[in-house]
């Protein structure tokens, strides 16, 4: 019986090694557990495509890594920060806030494992598993690669296996026709013809529909940074003016809710759609979609603005 168990475990490990893809989160987690950074940026896809730590460092003199990704909820950010604190001593957490993520639930699928799968053995990983992953469909836990299309992964088995075994984290593997991943964790999207963009409804904040678990983990993260003397700044990146106008009621309600929340928590909240609206363009030409994901040139310009605002806020405090 024991031998059968050992064989099963070995087989699952081999399948995981060969079939689970090398994602950019693999590079991200490897970077933050093996290097020291002053700033850690967590949040959603807006943060991933809009905030370039290398550009910010040119202004602030502070090193940073971008751990944002689409599908990253409060629980993910919380355990990512706990993992980082086990391995290094960040000076500041920059939390990119997308209001829509606080009225929706984390969906099962490959994003559920995107972060956890890359965690090294640690206290944070055990806690993360117990409070999040253990609630998944058992297939997600035992067969993490099943969430990915085998027709896509099978032709890449050799490359995937080689990258993992050799410890290859070359960012060129993560480049596509539409974007490229940088060592800083930033993803640069290439410019698009905005005249051909189609509107799609973004994740919208709905008054009275806040998911309490999501807010609870945000509160836990704020409390954790206080316990560990880590600076904390919340940021909402610019959204195209077309989208702000189309869903003005939703966004106005969101700005009011989060403005009040962060004020009560004693957290600096930099909202580039209200107080800092005029510091950066909301023209659709700077973006790659109506949701607000910037192209690389715009992200570089915005990152400079964000860094300058962060510096000015720091001087005031």
Which residues fall in each region the model found?
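Active-site segments of SGNH/GDSL-like serine hydrolases
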Residues: 222-247
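Membrane-embedded segments
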Residues: 46-133
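Long, positively charged, glycine-interspersed low-complexity recognition regions
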Residues: 248-317
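Hydrophobic membrane-insertion alpha-helices, especially the h-region
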Residues: 1-18
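Short hydrophobic beta-strand that contains or immediately precedes a catalytic carboxylate
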Residues: 40-43
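Residue-level recognition of beta-strand->loop/alpha-helix junctions
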Residues: 68, 236, 271-273
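Secreted/periplasmic serine-hydrolase-like ester/acetyl group-modifying domain
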Residues: 112-228
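Alpha-helical transmembrane signal-anchor/signal-peptide segments
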Residues: 20-38
């Amino acid at each position: 019986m024991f031998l059968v168990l050992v064989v099963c475990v070995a087989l699952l490990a081999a399948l995981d090694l060969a079939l689970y893809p090398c994602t950019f989160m693999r590079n991200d987690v490897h970077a933050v557990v093996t290097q020291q950074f002053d700033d850690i940026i967590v949040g959603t896809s807006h943060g991933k495509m809009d905030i370039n730590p290398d550009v910010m460092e040119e202004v602030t003199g502070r090193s940073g890594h971008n751990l944002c990704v689409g599908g990253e909820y409060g629980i993910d950010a919380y355990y990512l920060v706990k993992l980082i604190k086990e391995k290094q001593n960040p000076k500041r957490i920059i939390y990119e806030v997308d209001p829509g993520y606080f009225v929706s639930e984390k969906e099962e699928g490959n994003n559920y494992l995107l972060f956890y799968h890359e965690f090294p053995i640690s206290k944070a990983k055990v806690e993360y598993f117990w409070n999040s992953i253990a609630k998944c469909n058992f297939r997600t836990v035992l067969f993490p690669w099943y969430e990915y299309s085998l027709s896509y992964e099978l032709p890449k088995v050799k490359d995937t296996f080689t990258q993992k075994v050799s410890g290859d984290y070359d960012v060129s593997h993560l480049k596509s026709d539409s974007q490229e991943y940088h060592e800083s964790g930033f993803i640069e999207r290439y410019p698009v013809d905005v005249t051909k963009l189609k509107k799609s409804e973004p994740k919208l904040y709905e008054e009275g529909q806040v998911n309490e678990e999501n807010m609870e983990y945000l509160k836990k993260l704020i409390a954790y940074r206080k316990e560990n003397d880590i600076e904390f700044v919340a940021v909402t990146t610019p959204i195209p003016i077309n989208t702000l106008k189309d869903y003005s009621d939703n966004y106005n309600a969101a700005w009011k809710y989060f403005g009040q929340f962060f004020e009560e928590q004693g957290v600096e909240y930099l909202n580039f759609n209200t107080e800092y609206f005029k510091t950066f363009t909301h023209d659709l030409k700077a973006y790659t979609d109506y949701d607000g994901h910037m192209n690389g040139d715009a992200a570089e310009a915005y990152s400079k603005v964000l860094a300058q605002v962060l510096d000015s806020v720091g001087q005031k405090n």
